[in-house]
């Protein structure tokens, strides 16, 4: 099953016990230390795991567990992941390492945006694989196997990347707006 699972995910605990809190890291997905650190930030503390425990400790009504906003949930975790990159960068002594970490986060952000644009194109405008390939070509992605794989994944998982890409600024704006 490893080849079909996400690189990592947090298993939300049952409503009646709130435990166990499990983070799964797919061993078939090779990760650098930086990617592992930011993944654990996203999935664990202070990402999904923290968000779930904090929410549970507010003792919400049961219906609030059933009605959720995946955009807000993934937006929060992506917001936290961005801080994971910044945190890692702060602990590097050399500028090249810090620049690499910054570039890695920017690349991740751009990929989320590209995949979200593809999702809108495919599922709203009905783009074919050739039309999706035109967008990918603008970003230097021309390998036909890669294009086919990206296209097929987005076809099979509608709106998956939108909750990360568009949920992130919603979470960020909510957390940074001054209160009056």
Report the location of each language-model feature.
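Active/binding-pocket-proximal capping segment
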Residues: 43-47, 53-57, 62-71, 110, ...
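Long, amphipathic alpha-helical stalk/connector segments used for oligomerization, subunit docking
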Residues: 86-155
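Active-site-proximal helix/loop microenvironment
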Residues: 149-165, 169
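Conserved small/polar residues in nucleotide/adenosyl-binding loops
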Residues: 173-179
């Amino acid at each position: 099953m490893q080849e079909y699972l996400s690189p990592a995910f947090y298993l939300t605990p049952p409503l009646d016990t709130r435990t166990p809190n499990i983070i799964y890291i797919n061993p078939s997905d090779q990760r650098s230390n930086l990617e592992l650190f930011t993944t654990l930030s996203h999935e664990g503390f202070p990402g999904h795991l923290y968000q779930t425990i904090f929410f549970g400790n507010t003792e919400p009504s049961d219906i609030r567990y059933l009605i959720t906003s995946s955009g807000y949930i993934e937006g929060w975790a992506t917001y936290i992941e961005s801080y994971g990159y910044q945190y890692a960068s702060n602990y590097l002594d050399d500028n090249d390492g810090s620049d690499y970490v910054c570039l890695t986060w920017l690349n991740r952000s751009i990929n989320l945006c590209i995949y979200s644009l593809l999702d809108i194109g495919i599922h709203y405008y009905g783009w074919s694989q050739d039309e999706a390939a035109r967008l990918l070509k603008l970003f230097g992605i021309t390998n036909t196997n890669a294009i086919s794989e990206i296209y097929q994944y987005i076809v099979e998982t509608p709106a998956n990347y939108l909750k990360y890409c568009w949920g992130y600024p919603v979470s960020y704006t909510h957390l940074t707006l001054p209160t009056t």
